[in-house]
Amino acid sequence: MKTITITNLKGGVGKTTTAINLAHRLASEDKRVLLLDTDHQANLSRFFNAQSERNIYQLFIGKAAPQPYAISDNLHIISSDMETATINFRLIGQMAWHSVLRNKLVSSGFTALYDYCII
């Protein structure tokens, strides 16, 4: 699974729009795409009306395996919520969040199911 991260500290620069367009493009080319909404504002999740209690926060804390929401056959999303804002505090003294995320995706089996992961 190839991972593409779209990030910027400034809000309103098009991160969500870029992720949506890129994901749709890859899915239209028969690629299996997993979108990860890691933003506590959950704009990506709201755009697709994808709210779940088994979300990205649950993946980070290891409480439950997240349940990806199917947008289409080739496009799925793991949603976010306000609790996601506390992840950095929970990971103090551990490895960086991106390393934790990578390890969780591998151990949950997601890397074998998708061609691309867009964060």
For each feature predicted by the language model, list its residue ranges:
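P-loop NTP-binding core
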Residues: 1-119
